[in-house]
């Protein structure tokens, strides 16, 4: 019970996560990408939780959620292990682990960062062949 309470979030945060999930798009049939357009003090937490939650959907093996924080676009990446999100986000200046990674991109808007992420995902798969 203590663990469940620790992972709980308030209704406002839950609604934000639900909206992010509802806007998710699939690339390569199993990678979810979504955007959190609001800028608030908890953007990075909301994006991380949404990226985690996207992995609970069947057939999604990796997820990336982009959000605004100050003058940066933050990316939270998650994977069930089949796709190395660390390698993908390192190409955008980030880092982490095979199943959990993040990046902060400056000097680009949300659409540019999203396209750059898709380019890096394409590059990742072309290198796997």
Kindly label every feature range from the protein language model.
Residues 1-129:
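Hydrophobic helix-and-loop "lid/oligomerization" segment in the mid-to-C-terminal part
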